[in-house]
């Protein structure tokens, strides 16, 4: 709604699929609802195109290697999960080692089904009430940003969260 027409016109000339979304009314903690909504809409577009894999970046991420996506796909093939239910999501790490459930959201790569489950559309303030019993901090861990996304994903996988580093490692 608020993108200048001149910008839209220049983007349409690039031979890309341009997805325009209406912004959610509530942006959520640190605009997390904007990221969830736009990513969920992009995943739906990818499903319609019958894509098998998805790379998701934030606007503050740049990938310069022309072989990087092939590298990511090869990593998934070299390190499979031992069950038929799930696959891995490749992610960047930016200080998440000592913060439980902080899988980076700057770059992610995975099978479309897995990425769809991770980015399942729901909104932070609703989930804080429903899933986390109104708690915004659990065992000294803030339920925000990447931690919110990762724990929501793990809960969808029926994983029992312990909210400690041992469980995360």
Predicted regions and their residues:
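Active-site-proximal specificity loops/subdomain of glycosyltransferases
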Residues: 1-49
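Short, aromatic/basic amphipathic alpha-helical patches
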Residues: 4-15, 68-75, 153
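Short, Asp-centered acidic motifs that coordinate Mg2+ and/or phosphate
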Residues: 17, 53, 88-89
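Histidine-centered beta-alpha loop that forms part of the nucleotide-sugar donor binding/catalytic region
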Residues: 23, 58-59, 92-95
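Conserved glycosyltransferase catalytic-site signature
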Residues: 32-40, 61, 142-147
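Short beta-strand-to-loop acidic/aromatic patch adjacent to the donor-nucleotide binding site
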Residues: 51-62
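Catalytic core and acceptor-binding pocket of nucleotide-sugar-dependent glycosyltransferases
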Residues: 63-69, 76-169
